[in-house]
Amino acid sequence: CGPFNPVAHITDLVSWNLYLGWYVPGLFLNDLWMDFFHLVYPGRPLGFSEYGAEGMPNLHSSKPRRGDHTEEYQAKYHEYMLRCFDRHKWMWATHVWNMFDFAADARDQGGEPGMNHKGLVTFDRKTRKDSFYLYKAWWSDENFVHICSKRFTDRTESEMEVKVYSNQKSVALYVNGEKAGEQTGEHVFSFRVPLTGEIEVRAVAGDCTDTASFRHVDTPNPSYKLVKTKSKSANWV
């Protein structure tokens, strides 16, 4: 029900399932919705009982868009949501949907029928998507550094973004053994590096390291893009 429905005001606490930025276009709507609710009901505790976006570890884009099911859009979505929640510290609870991909018989999306791919980890529990490491950067005290989009090896651009997640305050990036830059910040670090031929990048944060390889190609790798077909679940993204 909506925020004005009397049912929404029976309990002491309330949470909504909201997928603004996934089923509904516009990530910024999350901020507007929360601000509006808090303006109208300043004493009413608000939570998010579900939020998420689907992401496939085999689908990739350097310009991710809502509905493309790429690992990159899922990460972009969760980056926004975590910053959004941090801006609204009066919220009482948030519940990411979901930790793992799960069976959903009526769905036919992302190139794998019968599954919901909103998990931070694949259904078999073997592959941690980039979004998993984003939450680790925000929530975990275990020191780590993670280079994103490792599976997005083939790139057509002459300059690429190397995104790094870490819970350390400083991250240095090396390209083919040469230091390309160092940044201080929180959670998300972004570097621009030239891409000619094949490169190996290494991220260093304290005593933590991570490596990845990328190569320049003339034409996009077709396996990175989802080919959508009409299905019984076409009403979903």
Predicted segment positions?
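Extended substrate-binding grooves/exosites of carbohydrate-active enzymes
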Residues: 1-180, 184, 190-210, 218-224, ...
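Compositionally biased low-complexity segments at domain edges in trafficked proteins
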Residues: 227-237
